């Protein structure tokens, strides 16, 4: 076995080991390997499935799927309404200038928690009106509807006001105090459109600790607000040119991130569309949740059921919590769902000796736009209780880890393409040996993961050709209770900030594949 044969096998083994680091990304990394050894039919050598092609042969001709990812973050979601409005204007203009004026604004919208709610409002509008036109205005209207006046905080803030009037430099600003005490008042009395307290608080029936009561809130105000702006169930179709809705939640018993999908996963014997989510359950038995009619309001509430606020949301006998617990930035769920859908669409036809046009058989590449509500870099170490709590939330909710994974996938694709070009002048025997490697099967690591030939996985190769991040930044008046501040002053400010920051400061360009 020469160096190139050893290298090929080594790459496969590396991808198997990489699954320990990130099982969800394993298949995409394997795809990256196979992207380097893409296939074309060669009329003079019919038995060869591996042929040389340049770096851009496939990606120059592949369709691009444009995806929007919306983080969770409670009231901070108003920022996404402004950012989306600016994005819709920016992308519409760019598409017209490039001669793609008929291109859909987004093909996929994925969200967690409040991001899932925003996503549902947007996709529902497109399904109902058969156009993206007006969707940005609809989302802004939704947030204006959710907002409420600043409550009377005079009594609650008396101690702060006394120190503030003494010019105590440690005292919060007047705006920070308004936000902080408004949320404290909301926690006592609720807000009309989002949550209301369930009284009395739940007693501790385990330790019987009188100080350990659990305050819970009713979801009905939020449910009614969502249903006023989105129609359920939401079932969409690629063939109809409708956007795909991905909603992420957390299975409490299994401790797993779960994605609900508006696109079909197959058809039954009567040709009726099947929509379902399958994931490993107890003792590795697969858990199957079917929702053939589409994503319901329960799926949205499951994505937004904060343990600190709401009871579990039950779906098909399973109990769910907020998706942000495990995946506040659902990039990995987007990548996996994109791959699985196109595996289904392309089918399971054997590839050997049959590929004529690689571009027509492979998964469309992804262009991702991510609207972050949290930032991990602050360059400060707070010492006050509220500041420390806020900093903890920022770091925990940012999810930079998953952004790095998506970047890593593309880096591996590019690296292996370069290795391929180095090997393009090797002899036919070497290529034949590599073909044998590609006939090997992947290792199935769970009951829900299929074992495929590496050759078959060629059909699902794709890249993240663009990743743009729009990130909200805190101002000097920020507080740890920012996710609960639904006052009209704050909501209007967040919408404006989202719009202006998207236009004035061009989104951070993380990945841009030059064709």
State the predicted function of each range.
Residues 330-375:
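A short alpha/beta connector and helix-capping loop motif
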Residues 202-228, 235-343, 483:
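Active-site gating loop/helix substructures
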Residues 72-75, 253:
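Short polar catalytic/cofactor-binding loops
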Residues 337, 382-383:
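Eukaryote-biased recognition of electropositive, low-complexity segments
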Residues 61-67, 75-212, 226, 261-283, ...:
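Patatin-like phospholipase
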Residues 59, 210, 327, 373-375, ...:
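C-terminal helical/tail subdomains of lipid-metabolizing enzymes
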């Amino acid at each position: 076995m020469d160096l190139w044969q050893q290298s090929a096998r080594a790459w496969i083994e590396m991808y198997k080991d990489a699954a320990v680091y990130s099982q969800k990304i394993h298949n995409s990394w394997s795809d990256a390997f196979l992207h380097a050894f893409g296939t074309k039919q060669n009329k003079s050598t019919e038995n060869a499935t591996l042929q040389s092609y340049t770096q851009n042969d496939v990606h120059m001709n592949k369709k691009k799927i444009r995806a929007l990812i919306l983080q969770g973050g409670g009231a901070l979601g108003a920022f996404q309404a402004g950012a989306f409005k600016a994005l819709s204007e920016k992308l519409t203009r760019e598409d017209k200038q490039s001669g793609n004026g008929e291109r859909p604004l987004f093909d996929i919208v994925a969200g967690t928690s409040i991001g899932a709610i925003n996503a549902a409002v947007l996709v529902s509008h497109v399904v109902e009106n058969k156009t993206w036109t007006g969707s940005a205005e609809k989302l802004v209207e939704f947030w204006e509807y959710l907002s409420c006046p600043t409550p009377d905080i005079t009594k609650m803030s008396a101690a702060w006001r006394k120190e503030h009037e003494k010019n105590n430099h440690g005292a919060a600003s007047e705006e920070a105090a308004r936000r902080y005490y408004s949320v404290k008042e909301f926690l006592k009395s609720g807000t009309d459109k989002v949550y209301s307290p369930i009284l009395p608080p739940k007693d501790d029936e385990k330790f019987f600790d009188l100080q350990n009561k659990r305050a819970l809130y009713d979801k009905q105000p939020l449910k009614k607000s969502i249903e006023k702006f989105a129609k359920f169930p939401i079932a969409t179709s690629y063939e109809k040119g409708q956007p795909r809705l991905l909603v992420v939640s957390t299975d409490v018993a299994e401790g797993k991130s779960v994605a609900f999908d508006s696109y079909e996963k197959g058809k039954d014997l009567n040709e009726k569309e099947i929509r379902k989510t399958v994931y490993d359950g107890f003792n590795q038995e697969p858990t199957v949740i079917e929702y053939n009619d589409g994503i319901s309001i329960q799926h949205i509430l499951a994505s937004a059921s904060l343990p600190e606020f709401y009871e579990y949301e039950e779906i098909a006998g399973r109990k769910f919590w907020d998706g942000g617990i495990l995946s506040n930035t659902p990039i990995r769920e987007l990548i996996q769902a994109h791959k699985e859908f196109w595996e289904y669409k392309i089918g399971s036809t054997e590839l050997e000796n049959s590929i004529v046009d690689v571009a027509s058989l492979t998964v469309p590449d992804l262009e991702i736009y991510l609207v972050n509500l949290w930032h991990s870099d602050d360059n400060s170490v707070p010492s006050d209780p509220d500041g420390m709590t806020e900093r903890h939330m920022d770091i925990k909710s940012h999810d930079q880890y998953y952004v790095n994974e998506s970047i890593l996938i593309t880096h591996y694709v590019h690296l292996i393409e370069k290795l391929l070009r180095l090997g393009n002048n090797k002899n036919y025997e070497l290529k034949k040996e590599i073909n044998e490697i590609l006939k090997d099967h992947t290792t199935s690591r769970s009951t829900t993961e299929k074992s495929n030939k590496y050759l078959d996985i060629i059909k699902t190769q794709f890249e993240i050709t663009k990743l743009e991040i729009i990130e909200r930044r805190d101002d000097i008046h920020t507080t740890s209770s920012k996710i609960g501040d639904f006052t009209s002053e704050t909501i209007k400010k967040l919408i404006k900030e989202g719009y202006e920051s998207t236009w004035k400061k061009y989104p951070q360009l993380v990945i841009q594949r030059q064709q």
